[in-house]
């Protein structure tokens, strides 16, 4: 009986230690992180809606593509122009495009440094005007590739926290 009690105590201590390690692991999936990511998405959506002069909702497909693209590029310190963008072809004339937001002041046209926010340190989330303008210019280029009559029909923003830094990718749907 004594051995069973000791074994039970050891098992409970092990389970508690694992629970503590898991809780303190900082995986970036806790409620505060999710709240910060949602706030970043809202701020960027508002800025994009202002730029387009329309009231788009955050499109789920574009948001998911944005988050997947952030995850795919997370390990890279800098990105090339091709790595900055991701495309998802829905049909021959309908495409979703996303761009990871980057720090214009640290980028040189060949290597783009991803911009990020740290939830504990960021008092406000301010989308960089130059990045938004670059996105709009490149979006016009992408629209031209689809066709002269192509239109932007949806916008989306995805945010993902990786190793304590929250990255944002913005995107649109082009239909021609």
Regions inferred by a protein language model and the residue ranges of each:
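Bacterial Sec-dependent N-terminal signal peptides
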Residues: 1-11
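Short, low-structural-confidence N-terminal segments
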Residues: 11-14, 34
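C-terminal motif of bacterial Sec signal peptides marking the signal peptidase cleavage site
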Residues: 19-23
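Short, conserved catalytic or interaction motifs in soluble domains
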Residues: 26
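Short, well-ordered surface patches within globular domains
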Residues: 29-100, 155
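A well-ordered secondary-structure block
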Residues: 91-176
């Amino acid at each position: 009986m004594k051995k069973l009690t000791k074994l039970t105590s050891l098992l409970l201590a092990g389970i508690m230690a694992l629970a503590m390690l898991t809780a303190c692991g900082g995986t970036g999936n806790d409620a505060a992180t999710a709240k910060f990511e949602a706030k970043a998405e809202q701020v960027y959506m508002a800025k994009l809606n202002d730029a387009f002069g329309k009231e788009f909702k955050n499109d789920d497909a574009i948001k998911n593509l944005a988050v997947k693209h952030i995850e795919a590029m997370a390990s890279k310190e800098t990105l090339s122009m091709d790595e900055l963008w991701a495309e998802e072809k829905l049909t021959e004339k309908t495409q979703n495009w996303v761009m990871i937001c980057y720090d214009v002041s640290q980028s040189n046209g060949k290597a783009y440094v991803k911009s990020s926010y740290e939830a504990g340190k960021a008092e406000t989330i301010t989308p960089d005007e130059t990045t938004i303008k670059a996105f709009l210019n490149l979006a016009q280029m992408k629209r031209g590739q689809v066709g002269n009559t192509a239109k932007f029909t949806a916008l989306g923003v995805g945010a993902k926290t990786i190793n304590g830094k929250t990255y944002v990718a913005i995107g649109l749907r082009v239909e021609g």
